[in-house]
């Protein structure tokens, strides 16, 4: 899908501002400069009062790996067992689109038996998901692995980062 971190922020702003003709440069985040890479890009952070935004690293991690029963799991399907990289029709309840199992993106929710303990879908595999974490000064956090990466990238122990212009 090749969505940059800044594209994701602009989409969040658009949603935050009610869609339609809503502004993409202010809202949940203030993006300065009017260019694809904002002049404040390395330091842009969530504005107070935002109602639609990217998650922080901690918010993403909890939604994917935490059980309301007080346990953290290794994989975002509510299990410590290694996730199976399979096509959606072979979903066993611990499955994802990873390791070239499908060789393409799948629809959101295609692995209907493989929700996290909070009921979220697709936090493992399919596409990398940006979060707000700043890593190494100029990169931003991302989680979840993708359809082209091995199952290890889905694990709680595998945080990742990438250039925000990605």
Task: Tell me what each language-model feature is.
Residues 1-2:
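Extracytoplasmic Gram-positive cell-surface binding/anchoring modules and repeats
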Residues 5-155:
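Functional-site microenvironments in short loops/helix caps that host divalent-cation chemistry
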Residues 156-163:
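Short, P/G- and charge-enriched loop/turn segments at secondary-structure junctions
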């Amino acid at each position: 899908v090749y969505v940059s971190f800044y594209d994701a922020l602009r989409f969040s702003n658009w949603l935050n501002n009610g869609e339609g003709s809503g502004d993409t440069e202010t809202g949940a985040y203030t993006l300065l400069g009017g260019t694809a890479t904002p002049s404040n890009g390395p330091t842009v952070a969530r504005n107070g009062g935002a109602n639609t935004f990217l998650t922080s690293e901690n918010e993403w991690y909890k939604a994917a790996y935490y059980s309301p029963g007080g346990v953290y799991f290794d994989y975002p399907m509510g299990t410590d067992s290694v996730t199976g990289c399979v096509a959606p029709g072979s979903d066993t309840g611990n499955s994802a689109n990873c390791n070239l199992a499908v060789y393409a993106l799948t629809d959101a929710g295609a692995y209907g038996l493989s929700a996290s303990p909070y009921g979220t879908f697709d936090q493992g595999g399919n596409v990398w998901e940006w979060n707000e974490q700043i890593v190494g000064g100029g990169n931003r956090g991302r989680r979840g692995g993708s359809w082209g990466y091995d199952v290890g990238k889905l694990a709680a122990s595998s945080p990742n980062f990438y250039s925000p212009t990605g």
